[in-house]
Amino acid sequence: MNRRDFTFMLPIIALGMSLLVGRALGQQKPLTEQLLGTLTLVSHESVRADGTRTPVYGINPKGIAFFDASGHFIITVMRADRAKYAIDFSTQGTADENKATAQGTMTYFGTYSVDQADHTIALHIEGSSFPNWNGADQKRVFAIAEDQLTLTARALQTGGYAEVVWKRAN
């Protein structure tokens, strides 16, 4: 290829490169769209101010989160090692069984909104297994990397924060 051919080809190459870069940048979905779908729980930890981590729902917690396009969500987390009740009626557990259930399960649902600029999600909780959250608004910082969502929330009682890691369901 001589110099004249190269000079002619250079603008075409530059145009092609800019189109490829523009297309790649255009494929980055807004955070709200990246959040949509079903996620399974990886971990749910309390992180103290000194960095100490404690699993809130045990070593291998179970959970599912669902965020839909109309702005609704539901989140359920629980200990994987919960004992079964002695009888097969959920409303007739013993005091100890009911206590273990209350301490080993958290479910809440409502609507959500995303703030793209500060990477936060506001959860507008309509109902929760923990009654104090009914009607509450809670804000979480979130990060999305590939198929993983990490939510963090400040824990006022400990001075640390809660960190919940979710993975996109297959």
Task: Label each region the model flagged.
Residues 2, 8-170:
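Lipid interaction determinants
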